[in-house]
Amino acid sequence: MHFDHVAVRVGNIQAAVNWYRSLFEATVIYQDENWSLLSVGDTKVALVLEDSHPPHFALRVNSQEELLEPAEHRDGSLYNYIVDPWGNTVELIYYPSEKN
C-alpha cells in the first residue's frame, strides 16, 4: 500500500487547472466536467467539484481483495471510500490494468 493522490475541492475545474498549471507546472492526466487529475512533480492532485467527490487522500492497494465493497470509477479503477473516526475520508484504490 502506498500514497496515490490527494483530492481537493474547487469551485471551477478549468480555473483550478489553470492555476495549478501556472503556479506548479502541473500536467493534466485526466479531465472532465466534474474533476481533473493532475501530475505535480511526483504527486497526483485531483481537483473535484464540491458536490461530486469528497475531499480525501487515496492509498493505492496491491489487490482487489484489500478493498472493502469496491465500486468502479469511469477509468476502470476500483475504489472504496472509508471515513476515519475523526471524519476524514480515505480512498482505497486499485488499478486492475497496472502493477500496483
Where are these regions (language model features)?
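Core segments of cupin and vicinal oxygen chelate
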Residues: 1, 7-45
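Short secondary-structure junctions
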Residues: 24-30, 67-74
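Vicinal oxygen chelate
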Residues: 68-100
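A short, structure-level motif marking secondary-structure boundaries and short turns
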Residues: 1-3, 68-69
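Conserved short beta-strand elements that form part of the metal-binding/catalytic scaffold
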Residues: 27-61, 89-96
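Short, conserved charged micro-motifs
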Residues: 15-18, 64-69
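Short glycine-enriched loop/turn motifs at secondary-structure junctions
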Residues: 1-2, 50-54, 74
